[in-house]
């Protein structure tokens, strides 16, 4: 048993939480009389019955179970003063037609009068339908970050539903310090950036414990790191910022959980089904070879203006031309449905078996940009000289290296898309499958098999083909296809009344294929409809156990385990033969690790943490040097590297609801498969070393009830981070004097540094809720050498477009009305300019090989309304980008705008 004082402290934190979870069993025969007679101060205003019961649970530390439908449309009177639990329940339920029953020392159930006895079988299993459990002995997942001594965050299913955006990447908006890159050209994928670090395995992203990540070559613009999922099948997203001994993610871990049988089957039922359907607006059907934006052709000649009397009309021969795309400005009406989605999930659940099957489908055409902002324009600069050649950049003092234009037309704006214009190649069609089966044995044993499938058809194009303000976008006739299949096996052993065994083991495999049309046409002899791309096979396994020991000298918690992962990537059949220039990576990478974490609590207010991880990586390059250019270094390379990653921390809890923590870690990341295997124009560097990130995390958590008003709840999480990444792995442009062709290679720079502040808060009063998330970067810098640190990203490096905004602020508000049946809300998001500058290409004497994607500060407003028609049906509407802003997303590889104002409506049925 845990020490009594520890239990008291845990209860103090749990008072301030509201947990919504299935109630599996409630026993009878508890000694509850004395507990029920204890007097507690209450400050509960007159409000809906559901809100009053939540306030009662927080103040009394009771867990209340009831059917959601029982409280719809019911109000409760104000409660002010010191009362027993019985007194409060009597007053709240007076005249409601409901009664209560104590089912444990700190638990109570509510049912219709006369139905309490029928609600329980002899063995105490509840038969109520949709159960809401409020307060008591569990912390809701959305509340957990506010009592976790680490920089964590959680995105709930409710938040995903309300603010899902036009791409899965949009679900991370509103999370301090976290964004997803390539939101508009990512083929419906997720590429998570945590505090300025992303890609190459720096952020470990899983779905039900399995990875389906793939790296996509984007020409000179770098790579995309893609994970695929449909938001309709997600039940929540847990985020750990920074390293953890149990994870390979040096910058953090994103663990997405898909729906389980318990999320679908209502309490007391054996079967359940959930059906969703909806539509959206602001999109148009793609038409092949359509062009958008402006095409400007300026005509001039080298050298200064010719002023010769014998050629008086010479300049009149150089008249520029300006044309614009046709058929892309016909934006549909605001409420005209132009895209749709639907999903169905069915499940069965009993004491031994859980089964679930789900399918989700969505289809959208090309979205339209907003109208208010820096859209494309063409300005007449008149007669002018322009330095737009390499010769001029190298020798600007020679006037004959300049170009003279009698009339020069210049693009302006953020992109080459006009206000409200159709953004080409942004269409997306996806289908997702989900299967799960779980078998529970005696003594806490269980096994679970799972399968997820995902297929997408998108207008995704190679990013290097879409850049340049003067480039006119063209709708490609061929699409990019992704096909992912993942299988999982999970074993759990968690016997009751055993604090030493909580065993978890997982085995998973993912097969991922992506096919794209040849970027530059490919071979003329290629088969009709030929597409090329990478094939990736990934295996993973892990095992861990948690043990708790109570001693006379304090409590000790241990977590220990091991993991293994194999990645094997190769070009698809025909890629080297028909996609004449593209040489994709061909190799494999393995990584094994073991770890142990310990938490020691000598007294109630102090916790000491420590951890140690050892990891080892092997990689093998299978590239064939005879296939492409023998002048380049395609030599087969093998990497082998490993090391230890220690961590420690301290947590102090001086008073109820207040927690201070300080954590330090020194974590190793070996080169990823992208960094250790050769590809087109990118050479392996045998001298590449592992990154080591030395991270400091300082933070405070506050949870307080009745701070500003009776029965309110306030939660605050404030943190400071300082990351120093030694031997940061980057990419550079270089020319080997022994080779004919220049190229790019992976290198280690001295270090990269990231530091900043993060704030997350939530305030609840009755049916009102306000959440604020903000982050501010104090420092971002890259140091090529120890004495050459700059607050600029490096020329030709992948990090060019991974630098986040200087700061971001998100405010989310919601209010329940009509006895909690109606919820109105919205979110205001402000994104600042880029945190730092960018190193110039001229410093290298070469052209720009990664174009910096620029954006301007912008503010987006999203609103929503949800109406619970009854216990089975919920209708929702939402408007995203309410003010129709024209903006460019940060962390993109292409210079194109995000979606303009879009209306969505949906209906969810649950039985």
Residue ranges of predicted features:
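Short, acidic, small-residue-rich periplasmic hinge/interaction motif at the N-terminus
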Residues: 53, 59, 113-161, 169, ...
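Extracytoplasmic beta-strand/coil segments of soluble accessory domains associated
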Residues: 108-111, 144, 169-214, 235, ...
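A beta-strand signature from Gram-negative outer-membrane beta-barrel systems
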Residues: 227-276, 910
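Transmembrane beta-barrel wall of Gram-negative outer-membrane proteins
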Residues: 288, 294, 298-457
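Face-selective signature of the C-terminal outer-membrane beta-barrel domain
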Residues: 440-454, 482-628, 715-717, 761-764, ...
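Structural signature of Gram-negative outer-membrane beta-barrels, strongest in the C-terminal barrel
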Residues: 440-442, 555-559, 563-565, 582-723, ...
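Membrane-embedded beta-barrel scaffold of Gram-negative outer-membrane proteins
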Residues: 493, 502-518, 653-655, 659-665, ...
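Gram-negative outer-membrane beta-barrel transporters
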Residues: 603-608, 616-617, 708-725, 742-840, ...
